Curated annotation (Swiss-Prot):
<feature type="domain" description="MPN">
    <location>
        <begin position="11"/>
        <end position="164"/>
    </location>
</feature>
<keyword id="KW-0963">Cytoplasm</keyword>
<comment type="subunit">
    <text>Component of the CSN complex, probably composed of CSN1, CSN2, CSN3, CSN4, CSN5 (CSN5A or CSN5B), CSN6 (CSN6A or CSN6B), CSN7 and CSN8. Interacts with itself. In the complex, it probably interacts directly with CSN4, CSN5A or CSN5B, and CSN7. Binds to the translation initiation factors TIF3E1.</text>
</comment>
<dbReference type="GO" id="GO:0008237">
    <property type="term" value="F:metallopeptidase activity"/>
</dbReference>
<dbReference type="InterPro" id="IPR000555">
    <property type="entry name" value="JAMM/MPN+_dom"/>
</dbReference>
<dbReference type="InterPro" id="IPR024969">
    <property type="entry name" value="EIF3F/CSN6-like_C"/>
</dbReference>
<dbReference type="Pfam" id="PF01398">
    <property type="entry name" value="JAB"/>
</dbReference>
<dbReference type="Pfam" id="PF13012">
    <property type="entry name" value="MitMem_reg"/>
</dbReference>
<dbReference type="GO" id="GO:0000338">
    <property type="term" value="P:protein deneddylation"/>
</dbReference>
<keyword id="KW-0736">Signalosome</keyword>
<comment type="similarity">
    <text>Belongs to the peptidase M67A family. CSN6 subfamily.</text>
</comment>
<dbReference type="InterPro" id="IPR033859">
    <property type="entry name" value="MPN_CSN6"/>
</dbReference>
<dbReference type="GO" id="GO:0009585">
    <property type="term" value="P:red, far-red light phototransduction"/>
</dbReference>
<keyword id="KW-0607">Phytochrome signaling pathway</keyword>
<dbReference type="InterPro" id="IPR037518">
    <property type="entry name" value="MPN"/>
</dbReference>
<dbReference type="GO" id="GO:0005737">
    <property type="term" value="C:cytoplasm"/>
</dbReference>
<dbReference type="GO" id="GO:0010387">
    <property type="term" value="P:COP9 signalosome assembly"/>
</dbReference>
Length: 317
């Protein structure tokens, strides 16, 4: 396992970066993954190639900005990797960098991304090749393997540091912590992706069930995290764990940020909103009933007029 970073930088990762990397990997895997029949006819010498096709590596750059000691990664774009030379296509990188600079003049290249379970020695060669663009690039690694037991995001951010190993200074990867940062537009987009309709349209009941399932999962995870936090505080009160003032301050700040559900103003606003919803439902029902009644009256008048004209002609004849 890579050691922890000592740079003191704070990293903020936006969901758009993870979506771009995941989409990039999915597209490449779909294009390169051979049919099952051709895989079955291959010999043992092609097992390594088959594994590479099943789990291809993708590469790209991450862009964003740095404010003081805070590095915020906003977006990413794809790069072309030359497996023969084990390097990135620099001309393509420079063209993409110029295009993104026109659209996002405040953003610059912070580093690069790839997919895999862990950083490798070949990754360090790519990392060093990007140091002429950014002297301290970051490496965002997404693990595409599905692990249902893992609750954290399969994303690791690495920095490079010089460490003396066996008397020789070497550059090694050190992993650093990060937080997920979102803006309103990203929250709306992620929520839209999470609630996409099925290809056949789906029924209202199916969509409602999926929505309620998502809410239930979120509440279940929130409940488990609150239980862990509560048990930790109880252990500190009993003296089983050392008292951490930083944790207590964060818990106190979290509790103060929650709205007071028992205040008079909250009850007043709740009742007002509740009555407004009832009034809207009542007006919608009245409008629907009025529309149905008008249709019945129109049909009755049409049928009565035809009967009257038919009866008149019969009497005249």
């Amino acid at each position: 396992m890579a050691p922890s970073s000592s740079s003191g930088l704070t990293f903020k990762l936006h969901p758009l970066v993870m979506l771009n990397i995941s989409d990039h990997f999915t597209r490449v895997k779909t294009q390169l993954n051979p049919p099952a029949a051709s895989c079955a006819t291959g010999n043992g010498s092609n097992n390594a190639d088959a594994m590479l096709l099943q789990n291809p590596r993708v590469y790209g750059c991450v862009i964003g900005l740095q404010r003081g000691r805070t590095v915020e990664i906003f977006n990413s774009f794809e790069l072309i990797f030359d497996p023969a030379l084990d390097t990135l296509d620099r001309s393509f990188l420079e063209k993409k960098q110029e295009l993104y600079k026109k659209v996002f003049p405040d953003f610059y290249v912070l580093g690069w991304y790839s997919t895999g379970s862990d950083a490798t020695e070949s990754d360090m060669h790519i990392h060093k090749a990007l140091m002429d663009i950014n002297e301290s690039p970051v490496y965002v690694l997404l693990n595409p393997a599905i692990n249902h037991a893992q609750k954290d995001l399969p994303v690791t951010i690495y920095e490079s540091e010089f460490h003396v190993i066996d008397g020789i200074p070497q550059s090694i990867f050190v992993h650093t912590s990060y937080t997920i940062e979102t803006v309103e537009a990203e929250r709306i987009s992620v929520d839209h992706v999470a609630h996409l309709k099925p290809s056949d349209g789906g029924s209202a009941a199916t969509q409602l069930a999926a929505h309620l399932t998502g809410i239930h999962s979120a509440i279940k995870m929130l409940n488990s995290r609150i239980r862990v936090l509560y048990q930790h505080i109880v252990a500190m009160q009993k003296g089983d764990k050392p008292c951490e003032n930083s944790v207590l301050r964060q818990v106190s700040s979290l509790l103060r940020s929650l709205p007071a559900a028992e205040s008079e103003k909250f009850n007043e606003n709740f009742l007002m909103e509740y009555n407004d919803k009832l009034l809207m439902s009542y007006l919608a029902m009245i409008t629907n009933c009025t529309s149905n009644m008008n249709e019945v009256v129109d049909k009755f008048n049409t049928a009565y007029d035809k009967h009257s004209r038919r009866g008149g002609r019969t009497a005249f004849m």
